[in-house]
Amino acid sequence: MEKLQGFTDHVMLYVKTLVKWLLSAALIGTVGGAVGSLFHLGVEYATELRTEVPALLYALPLAGVLIVALYRFLRTQGVGTNAVLDAVHQGRELPILLIPAIFLATLLTHLAGGSAGREGAALQIGGDLGEHFGKMLRMDDKDCRLATLCGMSALFSALFGTPLAAVFFALEVVSIGVRYYSGLSPCITSSLVAYAVSLRFGIEPMRFAVAAPETGALTLARAAVLALGCALVSILFCEMLHRTEHLTERLVKNDYLRAFLGGCLVIALTLLAGCRDYNGAGGHVIAAALGGTAKPEAFLLKIVFTAVTLGCGFKGGEIVPTLFVGSTFGCAAGALLGLPAGFAAALGITGLFCGMTNCPITSLLISVELFGADGLLCYAVVCAVSYVCSGYRGLYSSQTILYSKLRAEFINVHTK
């Protein structure tokens, strides 16, 4: 009888925990989906307005000054995606005012033509929302960390329209090698709910029709070579992002002046480039590359534009610029390797995303959700090669890699 009672108590504990998280995660997903959808629509409107009024580019220096003033006014200076990862790692508290700060700053960056994405900002908004919902629901420190992951999944899912990749990105990006699988069911719930909410807002998920060639040994070998190139480009991109930020902070101590000069530099670069392809997120360039058309120098120019924009204090994200760089590099390199240009662009996106984020499972899932499963083996090969060959560099310095990429060894290092 005692054994039966113990078994019953054991089962009820798991059922209660599951129900608690299903309800909590659904709440986070509902709010996160709504906020993420509004954020998506805001960035979309800012992009359309900038396209209709090209002269807004010349307001970029002023936008930079306003962003610095906004962050100082809300006392959120120095708080970014790394702080969200630290909140999961160490339970550090996130300021609630980070949400309006990154929301408005990203809109200003896109409105005036800074080269940035939105998913990095979404991770900050989602992580902050999740953590504060956890506190509102009187969760303890450990559960608040899972709530933070739920928020990250929800916002990523709402913006990207890739609910499975959103789940594993939140679980995978914090600590490479060990995943918080206790957060699997909560993150799936919040991600699916947020995705459903985004559809109700009329947000169309990112999907591309990419034809995959027949998978054979030669195709896989070509994909592996392309993945090696993606790994090298990801190292270059990460180095440019980090070194540009450190260099500008050292050369120009005043935050306002740094943002102002950064805006002026982006204007100068735009005039030199002779087009607006490298301002904003560049979604049309990604679509063109996946259609088989890209300038061979486009990936290098996007790296420079993004490094200057984010390094000088503008806000947004690095994920969509990563897709831009990956698609244009893949499209250009595919012609040299004998791969179909559009398919090579898809492989480039997969390889760059993996190399920049150190998240191979997420990269594989995102490729399937964006492009379909026809080229699954090629995407898997690209993820494997890019993950190993990109070394220990990454977008987020608070990301930890617990196990060596080269051997079965515990190393516990931060990305460079």
Q: Could you tell me what each predicted segment is?
A:
Residues 1-416:
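Alpha-helical transmembrane segments and immediately membrane-proximal extracytoplasmic
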